[in-house]
Structure formats: C-alpha cells, structure tokens
Regions:
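A common structural microfeature
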Residues: 10-12, 59, 76
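Active-site region of glycoside hydrolase catalytic domains
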Residues: 2-46, 89-91, 99-479
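N-terminal, well-ordered alpha-helical segments
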Residues: 60, 67-70, 100-103, 107
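Aromatic- and Gly/Pro-rich amphipathic surface segment
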Residues: 32-67
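Catalytic domains of carbohydrate-active enzymes, especially glycoside hydrolases
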Residues: 61-82, 290-294
Length: 479
C-alpha cells in the first residue's frame, strides 16, 4: 500500500512532562509533600538514584525552558499540576503561591504560542491524604479529588482548552507500589489494585463533567498507558490468551472512558479470582455520565502474551532496574487467563521495552475503529543512556531513529482515516525516571545533573532537538 497522508493543518506538535519528575521545588513556597516525594526519597536511599527535591528545576527555570520550547517549534506542551502545590493538605486552604506558579507558567506558554494540555493527576497524591486515609485505597479520596479538580478547572477555564484527567490508570494497577504509596499491610491485597482504579474512574468522570460544564469548547479525556498485545504464536491457546490480556489490560479501561461500562469478560475474571472492585449504588451511572471527548495515548512498546496454565502463580509486571538488556525481573501472569512474555520478533531498548513502530500504527487504527474518538499521543519516546561530550554535544541518533519511525507510523494511521490531534512525546527535557533516576533519559533537552549532584541543571540541546525542530517546521514532511 502507498501512503500519501500529511499531518493536518493545526496539528499539535509538542512534548510532555509531569510535575514531580521535572519541577523540583518540592517544598518551596508552601508546597506540601506528595506521595512521590516520599516514594522517590525511599528509592534514592535504596537504589542510589536522584530524588524529587530538585528534579530538573523547572519550577525555577520555566521561563528559560519555554524559550527553548518556542525555539524547538512546539505549539503544545502537556504537563501536570501538582495537587499538593495548590492544596498542600489535599483539601482546604489554597496555596496562592502555588496557584500563581501555574498561572505564570500557562501565561508564558500562551504568550509564546504554545497550547497548554493540562493533566490533573500524574501519580503525586498529597502525602497528607495517604497519612489520613491511605490515599486512593479509600473512597474518601474521590471527594477530595473533586474539590481539587473544581478549583483547578474553574481557575484555568479561560486559559486551557485540553485537559487530561488521570495519568495511566492501567500502569498504576500493574506497578502500584511505584505509583502509589502502599503500606506494607496492604501489599498482598491485590483486589485493592482494582479498587484504586475504580475510585480513579469515579474521579475521572467527575473531572470530565466539570470540564464540560465549566470550560467553553473544552475537551477532556484520560491519558492511558497503552500497549497493543500480540500472541506469542498462532496457536489457538496463545491467540485466546492475547484476547484475554487485551480485555483486562486495555479494554477494561477504554470501555469505561467511552462506554461507561466494565468489560464483561475481564470483570468476570476479576470476580472469579476475588479481584473485582466493590461498586456502590450510583457508581456506574456516574461513570457513564463522564464520557471522554478524546483519548490521550502513552505509547512506548507493544507487548506479547501466551497461554498460562491454571496452576501458574499470579504475579504482576516486572521491572528492569539495571538498564542491562534481559534483566527484567518477570512478566505478569494471570493463571488460566494469560501470561505476558518477551516477543522474540522485536528488538528492545536497554530496559527491555519493545521497539515497535508498527505497534503505534496498529494501536491507533484499532482504537479508532473500536471507539471512533479523536486520539492524541501524549507520551512516546526512547529512554536511553545519553552522553554529554566535552564540547557539550549530545549525539542521540538512536532517539532520532526511534521517533522517526514512530512519527512515520502515525502518518500512516492518518492515511487510513484515523483522527490524530497531537504528538506530544516524552519528554520535553530530561527528567526524573520513576524507576531509574537520571540514568534513563528521554528529553530533547539535556539536563546536566547526576544522581547525587543536581549542580545547576544547565540545559543543552541534543541532536534530537534540532531534528524535531525540522519535523515541526515542515509539519511532519521532513522526518
């Protein structure tokens, strides 16, 4: 097939970050602690990686960063608001300095022709709510999220058109101890993974309704960590396992956002295995009311599934902590349902994530066919070891190759009729990796710091910066 599509006029080209990974200023100007401040401090002590106290110092250097964004050619920037910066205790008294920071940030973006795409929640629940009632485990968090979302959406309703609600609920289920602070007494209560997700679905619906009620011409959706799933082989058992994995790892979330239901096959599996969330009267009506206008997709890699025996041991997704290929510490297994596994037909990066640009095209076409809603790419990128040379250059041709192939795949999906609104990859600048500190870098802009010493976080443009600049300048014609 010959592909002739062009990116549409008005296509949004940008890049993404999240508050705790990039801002720093973890307790500056009245900000309260978040669970990520605590989790990253524990990770720093355990594994010797950086914590979130300084991160990439965006809080103090945002004006310089936005100048670089404008030079890059970005016309959108996806970022998150730190709940504990504006409501240090999670509710109640508003921190006016924290709120003003986001006004200043958004005003600076708009003055430079950059459309803000605001994420309300990116893993960083106020620590006080964890201390008070165990955070997202408790249904109480839904009311506090509503107070927070109401504040932010009303505050920025005249400045922000595009909103995403909660980042990567599917990833939170798999990696809950990295994305939430889970007390030791709960670690074996795996039903709580899906209870947390249910509470987030209620919060998502509330935020969707707020945007629709408050923001003129506003658009809102969730940002999902999404991996299309292939069967390991054409054996019927593996194909069925792939279908099961899709139902529980993907459809279970998307059906909520666009149909207001839990995927029946996945929910039946959860019920049969004592993993299903407790659903109260009125919950599904609320979820049904909060329909998304678009879906924001965070795509890094495809995944692979095979049949799992009934007597297999249940486990959740593994992590490669070292950055040495092949060092991943396991794959999710749901007994009798599916087992995730390595795909022998695709290459991986140093952290064992599959490099699969065709998966991008497949994902976009599949989701658009199923749900017929506009799509955004709000994360996509290559985590890698970057080297700052003596003459202050960063020659990241591997990142250029990765992004070239993935943008080309988006263009092919558009040629097949898929409506894609934006490409906002991960990440605008190097930032704190949740698992790997500053060893694993994603940015177009290099942050000169290491795990122990943040130095002054001086910024340097990578080779990929100049390449992406040309991509944006030509609206994706020059890749």
């Amino acid at each position: 097939m010959t592909y002739n599509a062009k990116f549409p006029d008005g296509f949004l080209w940008g890049a993404s970050t999240s508050a705790y990974q990039v801002e720093g200023g973890a307790q500056d100007d009245g900000k309260g602690l978040s669970q990520q401040d605590i989790l990253n401090e524990e990770m720093a002590l355990k594994r010797g990686v950086a914590n979130a106290s300084v991160a990439s110092d965006h809080y103090h250097q945002y004006k310089e960063d936005i100048k670089l964004f404008k030079e890059l050619g970005m016309n959108c920037y996806r970022f998150s608001i730190a709940w504990s910066r504006v409501l240090p205790k999670g509710r109640g008294e508003v921190n006016k300095q924290g709120l003003q920071f986001y006004h200043d940030l958004i005003d600076e973006l708009l003055a430079n022709g950059i459309e803000p795409i605001v994420t309300l929640y990116h893993y960083d629940l106020p620590w006080s709510l964890v201390e008070e009632y165990d955070g997202w485990i408790s249904r109480k968090v839904v009311k506090d999220f509503e107070e927070y979302a109401t504040l932010i959406i009303h505050e920025f309703k005249d400045k922000v058109k595009y909103w995403t609600t909660i980042n990567e609920q599917s990833i939170i289920v798999q990696y809950w101890t990295q994305k939430c602070y889970i007390k030791e007494k709960y670690l074996n209560q795996n039903q709580l993974r899906y209870q947390i997700n249910h509470h987030m679905n209620l919060a998502h619906a509330i935020a969707c309704n707020l945007v629709h009620d408050v923001v003129k011409d506003g658009m809102v959706g969730s940002a999902i960590g999404y991996s299309p799933i292939y069967p390991l082989s054409s054996k019927p058992e593996d194909v069925l396992a792939m279908q099961n994995a899709h139902d529980l790892r993907n459809a279970y979330y998307l059906d909520v956002y666009f149909k207001g239901i839990y995927t029946k096959s996945a929910m039946q599996y959860l019920k049969d295995n004592d993993l299903a969330p407790i659903i109260e009267d009125g919950d599904m009506e609320l979820i049904k009311s909060g329909e998304s206008d678009f879906l924001a997709l965070n795509y890094y890699a495809s995944e692979c599934a095979k049949a799992a025996p009934l007597d297999a041991m249940r486990r959740w997704s593994g992590v490669n902590w070292s950055g040495e290929k092949g060092a991943i510490d396991g794959f999710e297994t749901q007994p009798g349902y599916y087992q995730m596994c390595k795909n022998p037909l695709v290459d991986t990066n140093d952290w064992d994530w599959a490099i699969d640009p065709i998966g991008m095209q497949y994902m976009l076409k599949d989701i658009y066919t199923r749900y017929n809603k506009p799509l955004m790419i709000t994360e996509n990128g290559l985590g890698a070891y970057d080297v700052l040379t003596k003459d202050k250059q960063i020659h990241d041709t591997y990142r250029i190759d990765y992004m070239h192939s993935h943008i080309a795949a988006i263009k092919k999906a558009i040629d097949l009729g898929v409506e894609v609104l934006a490409y906002s990859p991960w990440s605008a600048m190097d930032l704190l990796s949740t698992s790997n500190g500053y060893a694993k870098r994603y940015g177009f802009i290099y942050i000169d710091r290491d795990e122990k010493d943040p130095k002054v976080c001086k910024r340097y443009k990578k080779d990929s910066f100049y390449w992406y600049q040309q991509v944006i300048e030509t609206n994706g014609e020059k890749l």
